[in-house]
């Protein structure tokens, strides 16, 4: 069955994107150590992101938290030339992007994601209290930019990234509560927009789910038939 014939009858004006009932949180931030083997003792906490990962594992109804480094082979086959392109596509299929500003890498991720319009309203940033009043590029530029577009997108907490073992439990709990609250207020549907890259990713997924075996060229042609070149 040619997907173009099916899509020819689709009314884009009446089409909606229905988001997953099991949302995924892309969690970026500081270093998270891996256990040497399943029976090894847990290593010391190395970052707020590490503490959040452990917190989620101990919760009964924790949000599904995913870290970019869990995919080890992103650079193979030449699909992605750099990590940020990979993370941008990964973020497209996640419901929320949470960033703990506690490392050089997390600052780079913050700068990249904050400039992508599709992500600005699903971005939540956790900033150490000691950085909050600093007249830096991050505060005066990036964080102000996020606040203007997503009023609850920046949260300040009393923790010092240099001393991860001293992160208070109430900080970890508060951050997790903020993540859950953001997920609860996310829109469940959106009108389909071919100008939204996130919607294009969802559309590609649905095409593959419906037609199972599609060549890359067939997917491109099907979406082109809707009026979008990719």
Residues covered by each model-derived region:
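Conserved catalytic or regulatory cores that recognize and/or transform ribose-phosphate-containing ligands
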Residues: 1-230
């Amino acid at each position: 069955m040619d997907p173009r014939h099916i899509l020819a009858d689709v009314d884009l004006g009446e089409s909606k994107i229905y988001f997953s009932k099991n949302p995924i949180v892309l969690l970026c931030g500081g270093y998270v150590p891996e256990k040497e083997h399943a029976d090894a003792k847990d290593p010391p906490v190395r970052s707020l992101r590490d503490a959040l990962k452990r917190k989620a594992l101990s919760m009964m109804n924790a949000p599904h938290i995913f870290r970019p480094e869990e995919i080890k082979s992103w650079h193979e086959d030449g699909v992605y030339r750099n990590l940020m392109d990979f993370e941008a596509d990964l973020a497209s299929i996640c419901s929320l992007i949470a960033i703990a500003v506690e490392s050089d890498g997390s600052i780079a991720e913050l700068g990249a994601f904050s400039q992508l319009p599709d992500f600005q309203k699903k971005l939540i940033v956790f900033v150490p209290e000691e950085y909050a009043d600093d007249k830096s590029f991050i505060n005066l530029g990036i964080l102000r930019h996020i606040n203007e577009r997503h009023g609850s997108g920046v949260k300040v907490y009393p923790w010092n990234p240099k001393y991860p073992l001293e992160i208070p439990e109430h900080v970890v709990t508060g951050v997790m509560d903020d993540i859950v609250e953001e997920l609860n207020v996310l829109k469940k549907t959106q009108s389909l927009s071919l100008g939204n890259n996130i919607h294009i990713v969802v559309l590609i997924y649905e095409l593959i789910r419906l037609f199972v075996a599609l060549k890359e060229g067939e997917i491109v042609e099907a979406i082109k038939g809707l009026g979008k070149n990719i």
